[in-house]
């Protein structure tokens, strides 16, 4: 006896596979960031990716918190890694769906108070097209 498997089953597998691939992007993002490996971090992003952070608003007010494109991301993170050599993130939660990665982490920097952060990565075709950071 054969049992017919609805096409939806394949669709569900595709959804799960995409979510797992996106979660893997999140894991690679943390590994690259914590290693201060700028090129590995940037390789995860699309060339025209956008990034929002309240820290950008403070450090570079003219940006209104946004940088766009890999060259701008490179400059932003190079500055952060140079200024804050002890900067690293402790993962609290990492989850993903087919379009986004949701990350919660604790930002640690020597001589600064720890900061709990939420970040969303939007992913398309295996690359981050946008990232948004949220914290108090």
Describe the function of each predicted region:
Residues 2-136:
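C-terminal and inter-domain tail/linker signature
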């Amino acid at each position: 006896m054969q049992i017919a498997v609805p096409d939806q089953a394949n669709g569900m597998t595709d959804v799960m596979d995409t979510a797992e691939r996106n979660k893997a992007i999140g894991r690679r993002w943390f590994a690259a960031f914590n290693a201060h490996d700028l090129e590995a971090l940037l390789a995860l992003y699309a060339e025209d990716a956008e990034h929002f952070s309240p820290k950008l608003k403070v450090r570079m007010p003219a940006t209104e918190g946004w940088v766009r494109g890999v060259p701008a991301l490179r400059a932003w993170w190079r500055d952060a890694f140079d200024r804050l050599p002890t900067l690293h993130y402790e993962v609290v939660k990492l989850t993903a769906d087919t379009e986004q990665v949701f990350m919660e982490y604790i930002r640690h920097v020597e001589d600064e108070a720890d900061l709990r952060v939420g970040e969303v990565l939007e992913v398309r075709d295996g690359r981050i097209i946008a990232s948004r950071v949220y914290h108090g």
